[in-house]
Amino acid sequence: MHKSNNKIRQRIIIKLSGAGLTKENSQPFSNDFFETIINQLKVLKESYQVGIVIGGGNIIRGNNCQEFNIAEYHGHQLGIIATVVNGYFLKAKLDAHNLKSALLSAISCPSLAVQILSQQTIDKAFEENDFVIFSGGTGNPYFSTDTALALRAVQTKAVAILIGKNGVDGVYTADPKKDKNATFLPTLNYDHAIKNDLKIMDITAFTMCKENNLKIIIFNINAENALLDALNKKGRFTIIENN
């Protein structure tokens, strides 16, 4: 059994969107981004058991299938597979830093990842590793990575969900890129977000988070020490919870 320290560490879940993993020069992965994130993960593992839900948008998005003239179902399936590719890349980077991780998948791909068959699969992965990477979404088409994020947060009994946005530092009353009068919201409750249709994540995922009393922290993933500052309540971020 893996033991990085003797104290009981709470679990957190980090969402890494596929769009944030890439470079503007059309390369699917940004090495600088991964190095920056991993340096922060090294610090986090001393205090937390870290779960990571990873998207696939740097490779393909399920809802963009029309431009390829393929059925939406196939587009979603390709999106699911893309998250496994991204998860494996992250695991390879963690291996390069001698950090112990497990890649779990909601779909069967035994040569790459351990399929999530039960709660015991998840608990065992956390017991034996510093980081658990969740790929394959929910395993079903038409469900977003947000839904997978909420599901894994509930399953892991996470104390917080950290959602790193690409170039956005939290939640606003409107899209700040389109509305100069948009107001930044440092704190927010679920009911207000739903009532005002703030579109933080899809409603299925958001409702699951609300019903399970999960705390969500939204921040700019590209900011310096973004993960560490968000957890330590430094810098600019939005906290969403029931109150």
UniProtKB/Swiss-Prot annotation:
Example of a GO MF term: ATP binding
GO biological process, one term: UDP biosynthetic process
Entry's EC annotation: 2.7.4.22
Keyword Hydrolase in annotation: no
Pfam families (alphabetical): AA_kinase
Keyword Nucleotide-binding (UniProt): yes
Regulation: Inhibited by UTP.
Pathway per the UniProt entry: Pyrimidine metabolism; CTP biosynthesis via de novo pathway; UDP from UMP (UMPK route): step 1/1
Transmembrane segment boundaries: none
Keyword field: ATP-binding, Cytoplasm, Kinase, Nucleotide-binding, Pyrimidine biosynthesis, Transferase
Domain of life: Bacteria
Compartments where found: Cytoplasm
Residues given in the record as ATP binding sites: K15, L16, S17, G18, G57, R61, N166, Y172, D175
SUPFAM superfamilies on file: Carbamate kinase-like (SSF53633)
Cellular compartments per GO CC: cytoplasm
InterPro entries: AceGlu_kinase-like_sf, Asp/Glu/Uridylate_kinase, Uridylate_kinase, Uridylate_kinase_bac
NCBIfam families: pyrH_bact
Protein purpose: Catalyzes the reversible phosphorylation of UMP to UDP.
HAMAP family referenced in this protein's UniProt entry, alphabetically: PyrH_B (MF_01220_B)
Assembly with partners or alone: Homohexamer.
The family this protein is said to belong to: Belongs to the UMP kinase family.
Name recorded for this polypeptide: Uridylate kinase
